[in-house]
Every structure is written in structure tokens, then in C-alpha cells.
Regions:
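N-terminal accessory beta-strand-rich subdomains and adjacent acidic, glycine-rich linkers
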Residues: 28-300, 676
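An acidic-aromatic substrate-binding cleft motif
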Residues: 264-357, 365, 369
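Aromatic- and carboxylate-enriched substrate-binding clefts and catalytic-loop regions
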Residues: 373-563
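C-terminal beta-strand-rich structural cap/linker in extracellular carbohydrate-active enzymes
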Residues: 681-719
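Carbohydrate-binding surface patches
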Residues: 615-657, 700-703
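Bacterial Sec-dependent N-terminal signal peptides
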Residues: 1-28
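Catalytic domains of carbohydrate-active enzymes, especially glycoside hydrolases
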Residues: 353-375, 440-446
């Protein structure tokens, strides 16, 4: 038996040698703290291979790298290692806006140059190892035998060391708006079809394909996140799982012809990222994605400001109001359809009187802007017709007076936020972009929410292909010429480009609050988004729904699957420099004591502390408001009630703060009694501890405001 075991081991080694070969020269680097180690080699077939470990544990088993080209020999094998360069980099930089005031960018780098002798071509693979993870990318130098080329597929592997627990959504070329599924990797195939729910545009591609950012947890307590950074002039990467061997491989989004990238050297791929830790809080605190992006390209950023806003959007989403002006028209031809001769449907939300009321509410309660969707002609047949000339972005409906409303808003110290729904007719949008942005400037707008609902025109292109990624960035760069900030919905999920282009102030790119009015989001949804979608950048999640039962609707309908207190907590746990109070003014007027937290909470931060975290279960975060000593804490849970316990040791020693706690009531329940909440106030210091009970799908929020002399006399100590 002993000899048989030895023979088996030898046979296994020979088999592994066949697949991964041996390298004439192996290279390695470690992270600055020495906890992460990367090994790189070229095997006997000339294939690049890397592996990654953390504190001695396997994170990525030996995995191959390379690209398959169309009409050219691939960059897959036949390589020899001809040069290795290493470097160390350490800087601290300040984001224009963000979770923290400054970010350390500290890594060890190894760039390997590979020569493919048979084709006379060189390929560089650059690895950067941070304390919190790895980034690697392909670099294609300009050379005689590699000038213009077309990518058929990128074959970057991520070989898992076990059947990890994963939190995933189906791979799709056109939408990320799916509910998350928690399962073992080996279970994805059996669950994926059931996880594909209807959407306005969707193209799933594989029975084991999933999207990034993919969060996983290993049996021995490692948290592993796979994503990409600096997605520029390239197709979005998905992951396709070989579930027999538990190996993920990159799967790029194709164009209308099925090609996955048109390249001209010198050029490079986005970074492929692996964030890893044995503490879930480190995944949330990681700045690896931002660090792998280039610095801000704008010299003047004074015009880029975080925003807290309200708007008429929730009326339309819930069906209480309408984007369209009339029911008389079923086929619109811009410039020919005469809306003055049609009968208003009386449900059009973007009308003068209603918008003025929202402006008044914003002014009274300190909001910066009011978003108005449905203001412009064309909504009567905007969707489902693959219509090219669907909007012109400058012509308002008869009941929306652009100049009057913007003047009224200016008097009140408020701005209107523009809305550009493209109906995915991207060619039409680009034709009108300069005119649309100039119209904004002429009328006092400085921010726009753009949308890409439906199948892309040019027909056959996908939301996440190279062509569309170039469009999204073009719209952002063009907006900067007019000093306009962009909040892009239905666009590619972020990859940290907001560092380079900070006027990209928001993205949706996931299943947001709107789905609470359609089919509902799972209670654990917002405990996952910071681990997944938000790894690449902030999300315009649009929280703040107080009337969670949607009591104004009749009959059977969806409801918001959280407590009211959890809605408050989301302003802290779901980071964004663009935060909406999405509910109706009258909903807030019924709960003005709870609404106080939304009014006070900041949207830009000097510091953030992740106090508690477990993907799919709970998150507790403390953040320090930009330029102040005030802190805000938010905590949320999934469908399971829990008790959150934390200390206030992040507060400045020697100072006293007024703590106001907004928590679930004793009888709170997201299904039975979601609006039950309690408010408690007291004086605290950095030595205080807090223990808060959270209901099912519940939450809590705390404001910690530096105490005034009057506060010290009138407010009791925290008990």
C-alpha cells in the first residue's frame, strides 16, 4: 500500500508537470508586508503561469495566462522569459471625494517580458502586489509583428484552491440587475438558470458564467474577491467557471461581430484584481481598485461637488406618476408631433407645480439638487421599438418651463439635476451630446443622470463591450469640458475610473432600490453590494424609502424589504458621493424625527472605519464627515435579527459628542411592522460602547456630533 501511494504521488507530479511544466527560471515577489506571495514561471509549453498565496495559504493555484487572437497566432504559448524588472512604489494621494481623505498607494511590482520566438513578438505581464491583493495586466509593446490585432478571447485563469462559498450574479453582456445567489462554486451550474430573471436587455452567455466583482469565502476563513480595474478601450471581463476543476477563466464581452477587442500597439489590458484577507472588513476597506487607476487628469476640480438630492423619480417607479405627458400619442416623431394639441394625462410627474414643490422641500431641508425625469418630449414610445431618433435632450414638454423652474430653484438655493435617458440609442445620444450639454449650461444645470435602458443601438452591440465602454468614457470626458458631473445608469459596473475622471460621480450598474417596487430585493442584498458591486466604485442606490409598504398603491404589490431604520443606515453603509432621499416629501413629513438623520448625514468623508462585516450577513461602518469632527455610523443585517456591539474608540480623545441613535423598535419587523423605530440621545466619548438590536432586515444609524457648551448642560450621559 505504501509503494502504491508513492507511485500515485509520482504519477500526479508527472501529470502536473505535463499541464504546467517546469520553468527554466521562476520569479517571485511579495507584498510590502510580506503576507502575500506571487510566483511566476513559464512552463515547458512556453505558457505563462502564476500562483498566489496569503500567509502561506493558497489563494490562486497555478493558473495560465494568455490571449487568443483572431486571424493571428495566439499569445498563449511558445514563450521564453527574457527580462524581469522589479520596483517598489509608495505614495499618498488625495481623492477629490471619497471614503477617506488620503489613500496610500504602496506596492511591489514585477514586470516580466516574454518572447514568442516563432512569431517574433514580445508580451509584457505586469504584476503589482499590495498588502491587500494583486493586480496584473497585459502590456503590448509596439513592434513589427504585433501592430493591429483582434482579440478572440482572453484566457486569464484564476484556479481556486477549494469549493468556496460564492456570492454571484449570472454572467450577462447587458445587465447586472440580478439578485445575488449564495452557493458553493460547484453548485453554480445547477442554480444559474433560475437566477436569470427578466430585464429590459439581457444576454447571458454560459451555464457557469458569473460577473465580477465576485466575492468568495473559503472553508478556512479567507475572503477572496475577483474583479478588474481601469477598464479603458477594452471589453468588460466576466468569469466562466470550469466546475470540474474549479478554475475561473476570463470571458470578454463581444461586439456585434463576435469579436472581443480591436487593439493597436502600444496598448494594454485592464488590471485583473484579486483582493484577499482573513478579515472581511479588509475587503471593504481595500483601495486596490482605485490605486490601479491613473491619477485625476483634470487640473481644476473645484466644480466637482458631492450632492444630496431628491426628485420625482419614485412616483414614476411605483406607478403613481408617469414619464409621458399624454396618452393620445402612441408614435412620436420629434419635431413633428405637436404636444400642444394633445390632452395631458394628468399623471405626468415632471410638471411645473410638482417640481416647484420639490424645490421648496429641498430648500427647506438643505438638499442640493432636485432630479426631474420625464421633462422632455418623446417618452410616449421611448422603449421597446429599437428607435434611433428617440430623444433630442433639449425640448421640454408643454407643462415643464425650463427657464422658470431653474430661476425658481436658484432663488431657493437649489439646482435642478438633468436627466438624459438614451433608450440605449447611443448613436443618437452622441450626435446630440454637445447640444445637450450646452443646453444644460445655458439653463443652470451642472449634473446629469444618464440612462441606457434597452438593447443598444448600433444594433448588436452590448452594454459591456469595448465600443460601449469607449462611449461611456467619451460622455464623461465630454461632460468635463462643460464642467458637468455624470451619474450613469445601466452602464458598465465601475472599475475605479472615478479616480481618473472624478466627474463620474455616480453609477447604478446593479439592482437598486427601484426593484423594491417591482419584485423586491432580498434582505441580504445590501449586505453584499459593498463586497461586490461597490468594489469598483460608489453606487447611486437611492435609499431613504420610509413608506416601505407602498401604502398609496391598491391591490397586491411589492414592498420594500427593510425596516425604516435600515433605510437610514444605508446612507452610511452604501457609500456614494451622490445620495438621494428617494421617497415622497409627504412620507418624510410623517416621520420628521427620523428624517433628521438624512438631513444631517454627510456625503463626503475624511475617514471610514469598518467595525463589523460578513458578506451576506451584516455590515457596520463609521465615517467621519469631511472637514469636521462629526461621525456617522450605520449598521444593517440580513433576514436574521442580531445585536451589533462596538466601541466608539474612533472618536477624538478628550471630546464629548452628542450621540443620536435611530434604531429598530422592539416590535420592528420588515414584513409586519417596518416603520417601528426608536430614537435615543446622550453624551458620549471615545470610551463608550454601544450595543444595538437589529430586527429582521433591520438596521440602525447614529449621528455623533461634537457637543456644544449648551449640549453639555442639557443632555445626559449615554446609558
Amino acid at each position: 500500500m505504501k509503494n502504491m501511494k508513492i507511485g500515485t504521488v509520482i504519477g500526479l507530479c508527472l501529470l502536473l508537470s505535463f499541464f504546467f511544466g517546469t520553468s527554466a527560471k521562476a520569479e517571485s515577489i511579495t507584498s510590502p508586508d510580506g503576507q502575500l506571495k506571487l510566483n511566476f514561471s513559464v512552463n515547458a509549453q512556453g505558457e505563462p503561469v502564476y500562483e498566489l498565496s496569503y500567509k502561506g495559504k493558497e489563494v490562486i493555484k497555478p493558473s495560465k495566462l494568455g490571449l487568443e487572437l483572431k486571424n493571428d497566432p495566439g499569445l498563449m504559448n511558445g514563450f521564453t522569459l527574457i527580462d524581469t524588472k522589479t520596483a517598489t512604489f509608495d505614495e499618498t494621494w488625495q481623492p477629490v471625494w471619497g471614503e477617506v481623505k488620503s489613500i496610500r498607494n504602496h506596492y511591489n511590482e514585477m514586470a516580466v517580458t516574454l518572447n514568442q520566438k516563432a512569431q517574433g513578438r514580445n508580451l509584457i505581464i505586469c504584476f503589482r502586489l499590495y498588502n491587500d491583493g494583486l493586480g496584473f495586466r497585459y502590456e503590448f509593446p509596439q513592434q513589427k509583428n504585433l501592430n493591429y490585432f483582434v482579440i478572440k478571447e482572453e484566457h486569464s485563469q484564476f484556479a481556486m484552491a477549494g469549493d468556496h462559498t460564492a456570492f454571484w450574479i449570472p454572467g450577462d453582456y447587458d445587465t447586472q440587475e440580478y439578485d445575488y445567489t449564495e452557493s458553493k462554486l460547484s453548485e453554480i451550474r445547477g442554480l444559474l438558470q433560475g437566477a436569470i430573471t427578466p430585464n429590459a436587455s439581457q444576454t447571458p452567455f454560459s451555464p457557469t458564467g458569473v460577473q465580477t466583482s465576485l466575492q468568495m469565502k473559503t472553508a478556512d476563513g479567507l475572503y477572496i474577491n475577483l474583479h478588474e480595474a481601469a477598464l479603458i478601450d477594452y471589453s468588460c471581463m466576466h468569469l466562466n467557471l470550469d466546475d470540474q476543476n474549479l478554475v475561473f477563466e476570463s470571458w470578454l464581452t463581444p461586439d456585434a461581430k463576435g469579436d472581443k477587442g480591436y487593439m493597436q500597439t502600444p496598448c494594454r489590458s485592464p488590471w485583473r484584481t484579486v483582493i484577499v484577507s482573513d478579515d472581511a472588513r479588509d475587503i471593504l476597506a481595500s483601495k486596490l481598485t482605485l490605486n490601479l487607476n491613473e491619477p485625476c487628469i483634470y487640473e481644476d476640480v473645484s466644480w466637482i461637488k458631492p450632492v444630496k438630492y431628491i426628485g420625482v423619480w419614485w412616483e414614476m417607479i411605483t406607478g403613481k406618476g408617469s414619464w409621458s405627458y399624454t396618452d393620445d400619442v402612441y408614435s412620436v416623431k420629434l419635431g413633428q408631433t405637436d404636444y400642444s394639441k394633445t390632452k395631458p394625462n394628468e399623471r405626468h410627474s415632471a410638471n411645473n407645480d410638482k417640481v416647484k414643490r420639490y424645490i421648496d422641500f429641498a430648500s427647506e431641508h438643505g438638499f442640493d439638487q432636485v432630479l426631474v425625469e420625464g421633462w422632455n418630449e418623446g417618452w410616449e414610445d421611448w422603449f421597446g421599438n429599437s428607435k434611433d431618433y428617440v430623444f433630442d435632450f433639449v425640448t421640454p414638454y408643454p407643462d415643464f418651463d425650463v427657464k422658470m423652474l431653474n430661476a425658481y430653484a436658484k432663488e431657493k438655493g437649489v439646482k435642478l439635476m438633468m436627466h438624459h435617458e438614451t433608450s440605449a440609442s447611443v448613436r443618437n445620444y452622441e450626435r446630440h451630446l454637445d447640444k445637450a450639454y450646452q443646453f444644460m449650461i445655458d439653463n443652470g444645470y451642472n449634473a446629469v443622470k444618464s440612462g441606457y435602458v434597452g438593447n443598444i443601438i448600433p444594433r448588436g452591440e452590448h452594454h459591456y463591450g469595448q465600443w460601449m465602454n469607449n462611449h461611456y468614457l467619451y460622455a464623461v470626458e465630454k461632460a468635463a469640458e462643460y464642467k458637468i458631473c455624470v451619474n450613469a445608469h445601466e452602464a458598465t459596473r465601475p472599475t475605479g475610473l472615478c479616480r481618473t475622471y472624478p466627474n463620474l460621480i455616480g453609477n447604478e450598474s446593479a439592482r437598486g432600490t427601484e426593484y423594491e417596487a417591482f419584485a423586491g430585493n432580498k434582505p441580504f442584498h445590501t449586505t453584499l453590494l459593498p463586497f461586490t458591486r461597490q468594489i469598483g466604485g460608489p453606487m447611486d442606490y437611492t435609499p431613504g424609502i420610509f413608506d416601505t409598504k407602498l401604502s398609496f398603491l391598491s391591490g397586491d404589490h411589492s414592498f420594500v424589504r427593510t425596516t425604516l431604520a435600515k433605510q437610514l443606515a444605508l446612507y452610511v453603509t452604501m457609500y456614494s458621493p451622490l445620495q438621494m432621499a428617494a421617497d415622497f416629501p409627504e412620507s418624510y413629513e410623517r416621520h420628521m424625527d427620523a428624517f433628521q438623520f438624512i438631513k444631517e448625514v454627510a456625503v463626503d468623508w475624511d475617514d471610514s472605519k469598518y467595525l463589523e462585516a460578513e458578506p451576506g450577513d451584516y455590515i457596520t461602518v463609521a465615517r467621519k464627515a469631511k472637514g469636521t469632527d462629526n461621525w456617522f455610523v450605520g449598521g444593517i443585517t440580513d433576514e436574521n435579527p442580531r445585536t451589533s456591539a462596538f466601541t466608539l474608540d474612533f472618536l477624538e480623545p478628550g471630546k464629548q459628542y452628542v450621540a443620536t441613535l435611530y434604531a429598530d423598535g422592539k416590535d420592528a419587523d420588515f414584513e409586519k411592522n417596518p416603520t417601528s423605530y426608536q430614537i435615543k440621545k446622550g453624551l458620549v466619548t471615545n470610551k463608550n460602547k454601544m450595543s444595538v438590536k437589529l430586527a429582521r432586515s433591520g438596521g440602525f444609524a447614529v449621528s455623533l456630533i461634537e457637543a456644544t457648551p449648551a449640549d453639555l448642560k442639557t443632555i445626559r450621559k449615554w446609558k
